Amino acid sequence: MSKHLREVIKKKQKAYREWKKGGISKESYIIEVTTCRDKVRQAKSQVELDLAKGIKTNSKRFYSHINKKKTKKEEVGPLNTDDGAEVKDNLGMAQYLNKYFASVFNKTKEDLRDNGSMTNGNEDMEVDITISEVEAKLKQLNGTKSGGPDNLHPRILKELAHEIASPLAGIFNESVNSGVVPYNWRIANIVPIFKKGGKNDPSNYRPVSLTPVVCKLLEKNLKEKVVKDIEVNGKWEKIQHGFTKGRSCQTNLISFFEKVTDFLDKGNAVIAINAVNAIIYLDFSRAFDTVPHGELLVKLDKMGINRKIERWIKNWLKGRLQRVLLKGELSGWREVTSGVPQGSVLGLILFNLFITDLGTKSGSVLIKFVDDTKLGGIANLEKDRDILQEDLDDLVNWSNSNKMKFNSEKCKVMHLGINNKNFSYKLGTHQLEVTEEEKDLGVLV
């Protein structure tokens, strides 16, 4: 609040006291009230305008403001079980949700013991995380965020940043260079976040992991080093726009639709009829939860990441446990046999690296925002349609060999252009549904 606005509010409060004492008329008081109200509204509008203008440089501040304005908090349940029963109590719902979340994991429990199979990475270079790096990240902690299952709140860690930076740096370096991750860093409280659809369906909730804050601090340091290794080795994917430096929802949409528009323009110039485009929207089923650990580690090894960091990630993925936290009630623990934790720092970048080799052989346009994938191309003739279908088949083959599944019910095709022949496409054996509009990263297309 500005100094001028505080003075306006004080003036209104003073006018109120004067009016009550009979020192001024009601009309004079109302003038001060109106003036104050207008000034406050102008100030709020200016704040929101500044937030909107600064969304590219500080999007967290913008969305934090939006979330504070939301008065309605989405409730969980009641939940319907497989046998038709209804679960209403918080503990029962927590138990049932954790059972469901665990049911989507890849069932094959992989051997993640260090067998010396990592051969493509860099040399076993010592990882040196400095005290100043740790202290800086401690001071950047958001004191309003929730803690993890270790009950160490970020506000406490932030306030003690100077005192604990040195011992934490020692612990971090020992953990990474030995490849050993403490048990307490491999457990998570799961908060169910409602997506859309019926609230009685467990599949309509996203499991977000609240992991230990101390481990997240180390993850931030390791993420920086992993990104540096990937950039140095030229392994960073150009078509991935999700949680990538210099990329965003906006760059994803602009890049994709520039190419789609280019198809249309070239079609008009060359073919004498309007070029017809098809956009195929693809959606993975429980993408983050089903990433197979073994395949992920093989891919990381090929990307030239420091071997000590590879071994640390391997140990970090091994023997993970989760429980659901719902309104103070905690479910029992369940083993995590696949996936990368949503809510962790490394989870997003590991997923991005895992799907780096998801691609096509033709000139079709493929673009990604984390697990949201779009495939597009010209579809004037049967041969064009066949090329797009072959690309789809390649994507299905990739998903099968990488133990991932597309959610075929949510994968759709959109036809663009005049004289559209509305060719049909299949995702495996499933014929894709045609859609006339689609919400693409929050934008209605």
Which residues does each predicted region cover?
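Surface-exposed loop/turn segments and immediately adjacent short secondary-structure elements
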Residues: 4, 54, 60-204, 209, ...
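Catalytic palm active-site di-aspartate
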Residues: 148, 187-190, 206, 239-244, ...
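Arg/Lys-enriched, amphipathic patches
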Residues: 1-88, 140
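Conserved polymerase palm-domain catalytic core
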Residues: 284-368, 378
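Short, conserved micro-motifs composed of acidic
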Residues: 390, 405-438
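Active-site palm subdomain of RNA-directed nucleic acid polymerases
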Residues: 222-240, 268, 348-377
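Conserved catalytic palm subdomain of right-hand nucleotidyl-transferase polymerases, strongest
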Residues: 143-152, 201-210, 251-302
